[in-house]
């Protein structure tokens, strides 16, 4: 039987449901487990963690919106991740981890052989967490390093922390998707990120929605896109104080680059993205403007679901 998905959102989990989830994990019948915003007791959370520790079919685990709500649950999840070898995408958006909680998780994350996508948006992180995250980016032996990283809405991270991340992305990472939306980055940090993008050979998607940018940083990004060949395909600049003219110029240049790649490599290389990340802009009820690589696209690219896409590539 092919592995299936279990997706429950915002509901209290009964004992029977928890038993079914654990049985599916132990039988390796679950490829995607999403318990986004679900409510369950500590005992049942521990049962699920013990079951997912040995699951070999589980590729994506979504515990967004407060499921991992205490230090004891963080420790239980860390213990499960130390044993698990199959999870490629881990979503913890909206979990009150703090730097201390990520320090508990980090050893398991650093040693996990399959993890390529990590969502730590709105997790109350600061600069100490950034130091740990930077260590997850580069390849290490058989590990490929992270390919998708979400750090949306972590205002406790200072410019010093963001500069460290920019250096890590530029130097040795394999990151394709970097979501930094709804952080107070400002023009100075955006300038450092432009240098990182220009240096990176892999970064395809950069989300800077609602990050306090102005025309100053937009001009820097425009110069980068215009004068330096990069892998960048999508740059999200909604909810910033940037003129429509500058936004359109950046968008046009990215679209031109994408068209040239399609002519050279064929349209069959286009990545098919999934949405596993919390749609921060939609939660805030904001209007959205994006700079997509595909001029026919009508919506903001909120996430890539890259771990699942990579699994599909491997199976082909």
Swiss-Prot record:
Composition bias, Basic and acidic residues: 272-281
SMART domains associated with the record: LRR_RI
Region (Disordered) location: 257-296
Keyword vocabulary terms for this entry: Leucine-rich repeat, Repeat
SUPFAM superfamilies: RNI-like (SSF52047)
UniProt keyword annotation of Repeat present: yes
LRR repeat start-end pairs: 57-78, 86-106, 114-137, 145-166, 174-187, 202-223, 231-250
Keyword Repeat annotated: yes
Compositionally skewed regions (Low complexity) per UniProt: 286-296
Identification of the protein by name: Leucine-rich repeat-containing protein 73
Provenance organism: Homo sapiens (Human)
Lineage: Eukaryota, Metazoa, Chordata, Craniata, Vertebrata
């Amino acid at each position: 039987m092919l592995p299936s998905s279990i997706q429950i959102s915002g509901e209290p989990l009964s004992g029977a449901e928890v038993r079914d989830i654990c049985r599916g994990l132990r039988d390796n019948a679950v490829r995607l487990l999403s318990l986004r915003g679900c409510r369950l007791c500590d005992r049942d959370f521990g049962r699920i963690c013990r079951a997912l520790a040995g699951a070999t079919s589980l590729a994506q685990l979504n515990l967004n919106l407060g499921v991992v709500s205490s230090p004891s649950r963080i420790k239980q999840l860390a213990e499960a991740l130390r044993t698990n070898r199959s999870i490629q995408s881990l979503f913890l958006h909206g979990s009150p981890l703090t730097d201390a909680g990520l320090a508990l998780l980090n050893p398991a994350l650093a040693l996990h052989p399959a993890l390529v996508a990590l969502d730590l948006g709105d997790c109350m992180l600061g600069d100490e967490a950034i130091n740990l995250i930077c260590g997850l980016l580069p390849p290490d032996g058989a590990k490929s390093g992270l390919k998708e990283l979400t750090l949306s809405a972590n205002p406790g991270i200072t410019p010093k922390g963001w500069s460290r991340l920019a250096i890590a992305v530029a130097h040795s990472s394999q990151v394709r998707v970097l979501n930094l939306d709804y952080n107070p980055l400002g023009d100075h940090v955006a300038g450092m990120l432009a240098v990182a993008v220009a240096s990176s050979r892999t970064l395809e998607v950069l989300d800077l929605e609602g990050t306090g940018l102005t025309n100053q940083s937009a001009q820097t990004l425009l110069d980068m896109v215009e004068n330096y060949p990069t892998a960048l395909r999508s740059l999200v600049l909604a909810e910033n104080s940037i003129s429509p003219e500058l936004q359109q110029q950046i968008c046009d240049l990215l679209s031109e680059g994408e068209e040239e790649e399609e002519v050279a490599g064929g349209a069959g290389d286009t990545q098919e993205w999934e949405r596993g990340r919390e749609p921060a802009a939609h939660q805030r009820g904001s209007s959205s403007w994006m700079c997509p690589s595909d001029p026919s696209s009508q919506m903001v690219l909120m996430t890539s679901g890259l771990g699942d896409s990579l699994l599909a590539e491997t199976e082909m």
